A protein has these predicted regions:
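Catalytic and substrate-binding clefts that recognize carbohydrates or anionic sugar/phosphate headgroups
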Residues: 1-155, 165-166, 171, 178-183, ...
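Short, hydrophobic/amphipathic alpha-helical packing segments
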Residues: 64-68, 81-84, 175, 283, ...
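Catalytic core of carbohydrate-active enzymes
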Residues: 73, 374-375, 380-396, 402-413, ...
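Extracellular structured ligand-interaction cores
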Residues: 82-86, 93-95, 103, 126, ...
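Short acidic-glycine loop/turn motifs at beta-strand connectors
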Residues: 89-94, 257-259, 567-568
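N-terminal small/glycine-rich loop or linker at the start of catalytic domains
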Residues: 150-164, 261-274
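Aromatic- and carboxylate-enriched substrate-binding clefts and catalytic-loop regions
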Residues: 187-494, 529-530
Length: 684
């Protein structure tokens, strides 16, 4: 049951799509405070949710701010990253969900100030509070997801492997990447283009020197099973003769200063205006710009810098230059030097600059900071709504850096500018179920790490987790070590682990689609699947993938294995990636186990009484198009028989809901499998 309580006059975020809900007279569970709510926690209480954030699956012990922030240092001391996800579940003596529908800053003090107290602070008394009660943790998530709407469904090829870099500078560099993947039997479905494909960093342009025949090049790549996925940034360059800029100025489609003139900030191209994503006309106009690239054969995009990131606001920059002139005349001691460097550092993403510009919304003129968390959501919404108009029968790939709840209906996310740190493998695992709770099923980290120099073993171990995330993308920053998998010594292991991803695709795609269509979770904490198991509530480095698999990746350097907790008897599945993905299986009882895992191995666990559909002929697969989703191998641990509801479709159209997409597979106690519409062969 979902209950709603309104405070003040909230801005309609359009995050909620559910029908009328009963208004609460009194608030259950929470104590009303002048600036929010509090809840007295018991020692056994666990806090789940809050989407993409630092620290563990259990959010107790830290303070989190819902404030979309451009911050590439994802360390434990941070309180906010790129998104705002105001949904959490308290699980313990009371079990309930909380959603704060508010577009500005919300603080979740999860036992940081007071170890035993959850405090939720809202910047203004204009918001909707939702309390969700359910029969289980998964039921609470299900009800919440029905409230906020169906999760984004990408094309099937978007579940393939993607290779990215800041930046592949021209056509020949992209061709080289594809050729090396193919030469080393490493499947690949997409090459991602960062900012240097553009003409002087201008949105919806292509540099004619680097990509002289872009449409022909996109067709050339698609003929090899490769899609190009270009980046789109939030800022529009101020340049006479640039059509996007001139149209935006002419029609008043940009965010404005208090006096109504277009607000000026600096990002990649220098001085830019920000499209007013909260103005419906401006949003539709910006979305229509994607047609320029769609018409050239592009079928996928990623939206970046859409918190929005601000290198500098023009007015602050002017004041900074003036102050620098004053400092230039001084003998800088330690205090004045610190003030000088601090002044320059405060140019970027300064909170005060977000109070300088305004949006023209359906609900009137709004200062940006009061609706800050909606910008990235509505940039991706602009694209998603345009795709529905321009390509009504076709799925287009879209993922974003910034997001809040509501955006999950229009695209996925990648989890931003992580680092080549071992701790960030574990952080990526922590984020997966928390994002799933909030509706963001299509998500993934930068495999190998974006910042810093990576190592071969780190990339291999990261793929050991990444092959289970819906978005599988290797990405790294300009100036760092190149980390395409074919550049490392152990090419057979990399080829095997990427082929394993494609062997798993029938299961991964089926579980993703069922989660999206049924408002469920593709990835969940162990406690969601095993609610009666007290120890499962404490496990922070294992998750469930779909209904059948438990994964426990290795995330420490030089480790040749790890301890794993199994809540029930399971089948250990060991894949020898360097040996053509040879599979070894053994049954393990419930409890704690030390599991050896060599660098070229992937180990996961199949639940008793469950089935795992796999593709065939991994060595022949170069892209998702080579996977036969109707001709399956079946891995099973089902001494008493089992059944599985398998989903598959054409992977291209938006016609998701047909009953014929669901295929029933059964396995009897004698090991005989049958299916109404798929060919299956039992292997274990």
């Amino acid at each position: 049951m979902i209950y709603k309580k309104r405070y003040g006059q909230p801005f309609d975020t359009e995050s909620v799509v559910g029908s009328f809900l009963p208004m609460m007279e009194t608030i259950p569970y929470l104590t009303k405070e002048p600036d929010g709510f509090s809840y007295a926690m018991e020692p056994q209480d666990v806090l789940y949710g809050l989407g993409e954030n630092v620290r563990g699956i259990n959010k107790r012990g830290w303070v989190y701010e819902s404030k979309c922030s451009d911050d590439g240092n994802h360390t434990e001391g941070k309180s906010s990253l790129y998104g705002a996800y105001n949904f959490m579940i308290v699980s313990g003596k009371d079990t309930f969900g909380v959603f704060i529908d508010y577009p500005g800053k919300v603080t979740f003090d999860c036992g940081y100030t007071d170890l035993d107290t959850l405090r939720i602070t809202v910047a203004e008394e204009n918001y909707d509070l939702y309390i969700i009660e359910g029969e289980s943790l998964t039921d609470i998530v299900h009800q919440f997801r029905q409230l906020v709407g169906r999760s984004y469904i990408p094309p099937k090829w978007a579940f393939g492997n993607a290779q990215s870099r800041w930046s592949y500078m021209n056509e020949d560099e992209v061709r080289e990447v594809v050729a090396n993947y193919r030469a080393n039997n490493m499947p690949l479905d997409a090459v991602v283009l960062d900012i240097d494909y553009m003409e002087h960093y201008k949105d919806f342009t292509v540099d004619a020197q680097r990509f002289p025949r872009f449409a022909d090049f996109a067709a050339e790549m698609k003929a090899q099973g490769i899609r190009l996925v270009p980046i789109i940034d939030a800022g529009v360059k101020i340049e006479e003769g640039y059509d996007v800029y001139e149209e935006g100025v002419k029609n008043g489609y940009f965010c404005t200063n208090q006096d109504g003139t277009p607000f000026v900030a600096g990002v990649w191209p220098g001085r830019v205006h920000f499209p007013d994503m909260l103005n419906p006309e401006a949003r539709a106009w910006f979305g229509s710009q994607y047609k320029v690239l769609l018409d050239q054969g592009i079928e996928g995009f990623w939206n970046d810098m859409n918190e929005p990131a601000i290198f500098y606001a023009e007015e602050r920059l002017k004041k900074t230059f003036a102050k620098i002139e004053e400092y230039n005349k001084q003998n800088l001691d330690i205090s004045s030097f610190a003030a000088f460097t601090g002044m320059v550092a405060e140019l970027s993403n300064n909170e005060n600059d977000y109070k300088l510009f305004y949006h023209n919304t359906k609900q009137g003129r709004m200062r940006h900071d009061k609706v800050h968390n909606l910008f990235g959501y509505n940039m991706t919404r602009a694209a998603g709504e345009a795709f529905e108009r321009l390509e009504p029968d076709k799925r287009i790939l879209m993922y974003s850096r910034s997001a809040c709840i509501g955006m999950h209906r229009y695209g996925g996310i990648w989890t931003g500018d992580n680092h080549s740190w071992w701790s960030h493998i574990l952080l990526a695992l922590h984020m997966m179920p928390s994002l799933n709770m909030c509706g963001f099923l299509y998500e993934g980290p930068d495999i190998g790490g974006f910042g810093s120099n990576t190592t071969e073993d780190l990339v291999l171990r990261w793929y050991g987790l990444g092959i289970f995330s819906p978005l599988l993308r290797n990405h790294s920053a300009n100036g760092t070590r190149r980390q395409e998998p074919y550049r490392f010594k152990n090419k057979a292991a990399f080829a095997g682990i990427l082929q394993l991803r494609y062997l798993l695709l029938p299961y991964i795609y089926s579980e993703y689609m069922k989660a999206a269509l049924h408002d469920g979770m593709y990835c969940m904490p162990l406690a969601f699947a095993f609610p009666e198991d007290d120890f499962a509530r404490r496990v922070e480095d294992e998750v469930m993938i779909g209904e059948s698999l438990l994964i426990a990746p290795v995330y420490e350097q030089n480790a040749r294995g790890r301890y794993v907790y199994l809540p029930e008897e399971m089948l250990q599945v060991r894949v020898k990636c360097s040996e053509s993905n040879r599979i070894e299986t053994s049954v393990l009882p419930a409890g704690h186990h030390y599991i050896p895992v060599e660098l070229d191995e992937v180990v996961f666990f199949l639940r008793k009484g469950h089935l795992l559909p796999l593709a065939k002929d991994g060595k022949k697969i170069q892209s998702v198009a080579d996977v036969d989703f109707a001709d399956l191998r079946l891995l099973a641990y089902a001494p008493d028989g089992a059944s599985y509801e398998y989903y598959t479709d054409d992977g291209e159209t938006r016609d998701y809901d047909k009953p014929e997409h669901f295929v029933h597979i059964t396995l009897d106690a004698d090991g005989n499998a049958k299916s109404d519409r798929a060919t299956v062969k039992v292997e274990g």
